[in-house]
Amino acid sequence: MLTRSWRQRNLASLLYSLSHRRLLSQKIPDPKHVFTDPSNNEIVDSKHFFTNPSRDNLIEEEAIAKSIEASIKNQRRRRGKQVSSALAAALFATIFGYTIGYKVLYLHEHSFIPAYPVPKARNFSSNELKHINVDEIKHLAEYKLLEKLSMHPMIKEQYGVPLHKSQGISLESRQFSVWRQDVDPCIAGILIAPIDSPKDEHTWHNVPPLCKWRITNRSVNFRSFADQVLGRVGIDSSDLIQVIKPEKDCGDFKYGRPPHHSDGPRTMHICFLGEMKLGNEDLIIFRGTCHIDLKLQQVDLLRKENDKLVRYVLYHETKE
């Protein structure tokens, strides 16, 4: 009797341990999915909720979508070309209709069409050089240079005064070049004139029987443009801006006249750069400007010392 009850207890404990191990080995179910198993759920494509397309249908749909996209792009491109061509035609008709039709043919005046900006510093043309006495500018620059060098203590001590290339022969510039420096920003463009306008020294290209044209440069004076705009509403720029020092505002052009060969009231400097040999291997480099008066801006001395090229700044213009 005891052995039978003992066997029953062992069997019960064995079954309990097996069932406990099975429960521990099983995965705890997700409380969010008590009644369903998410592993068996299929993800349905939202684009094809009611249909299950085959591969052939997908290829056809992609081809249709690509053709629609291409047609939309072509339509937008065609519309953009039409708008841009219409704007270009309107701009062309407005500019050339006003400049040629109204100003040149009707009013018989010169007209300027701006094209692109150009730098302020540029070389003189052959026609402009005819009206500039380069030899006189060179002579004045050499005179100013020798004056500055003769007053410099280093030149007095090492080279002596007066300065001479050799006995009885004064120093002269070895190289001398000039160019122009405009004050205001400059724009290159087409200058159009009536076909029967008087001839001048410039080279013109005729468009018979309408007009003639040439490429030229014009300066843009923002202050005069602002004066014109304010003058239309009855306001003067002096009412808004008070110039404390007129010489600082106008610079060297306060009492200057524009060159008579220029196309308009353009203020410009004549800039120059020269070289003068001082001694056997010493070289003087000088540069400056010329408008009403000639001014030196900088004078440098270049010479070799211990097989090295050394630069001495003998004079540099300081602006107050």
From Swiss-Prot:
It is a single-pass membrane protein. Keywords: Membrane, Mitochondrion, Transit peptide, Transmembrane, Transmembrane helix. The chain crosses the membrane at residues 83-102. GO terms for cellular component: mitochondrial membrane. It comes from the Eukaryota. Residues 1-31 form a transit peptide. It is found in: Mitochondrion membrane. Belongs to the AIM39 family. This is Altered inheritance of mitochondria protein 39, mitochondrial. It comes from Lachancea thermotolerans (strain ATCC 56472 / CBS 6340 / NRRL Y-8284) (Yeast). The gene is AIM39.
